[in-house]
């Protein structure tokens, strides 16, 4: 039986950084421990709080290696490797085992439940709550 930690599981985090930011704003820590996962939260926190000493931990060594690849891509301005401003299903932000599952779920949703236009419109920041209700009822 192979180990679940034999490859990158999550290429990106699907949570936001707001909880951590609230803790930092309220308690003003000098140091913080963060779970590595896809590295999105840790990289965001270092961007917002560059003086914060952030230690990143993950039980899966492949996740930490993945984060280091993201750091190298950012330092060298290799945004294509991160899938910024282009669509590349094999980039760093799409390389986890579970990311493929999320891509397949999205495709299935678009093909069987709602079209791509409706999905994009629903999640567009410019879409109002009323417009979202209309999309949901169609």
State each model region's role.
Residues 25-28, 49-52:
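Intrinsically disordered, low-complexity coil segments
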Residues 28-40, 55:
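Conserved class I S-adenosyl-L-methionine
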Residues 62-138:
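Class I S-adenosyl-L-methionine-dependent methyltransferase module
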Residues 38-50:
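Conserved SAM-binding loop of SAM-dependent methyltransferases across substrates and taxa
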Residues 9, 34, 63:
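Phosphate/oxyanion-binding active-site loops and adjacent basic polyanion-contact surfaces
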Residues 1-27:
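Class I SAM-dependent methyltransferase Rossmann-like catalytic core
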Residues 56-61:
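Conserved acidic E/D residue at the C-terminus of a beta-strand in Rossmann-like folds
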């Amino acid at each position: 039986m192979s180990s679940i930690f034999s490859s990158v599981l999550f290429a990106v985090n699907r949570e936001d950084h707001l909880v951590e930011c609230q803790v930092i704003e309220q308690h003003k820590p000098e140091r913080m421990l963060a779970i590595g996962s896809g590295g999105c939260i840790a990289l965001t926190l270092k961007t917002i709080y560059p003086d914060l000493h952030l230690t990143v931990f993950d039980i899966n060594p492949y996740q930490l290696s993945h984060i280091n690849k993201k750091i190298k891509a950012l330092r060298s301005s290799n945004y294509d490797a991160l899938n910024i401003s282009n669509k590349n299903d094999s980039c760093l932000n799409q390389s986890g085992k579970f990311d493929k599952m999320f891509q397949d779920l999205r495709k299935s949703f678009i093909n069987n439940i709602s079209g791509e236009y409706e999905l994009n419109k629903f999640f567009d920041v410019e879409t109002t709550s009323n417009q979202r209700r209309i999309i949901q009822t169609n």
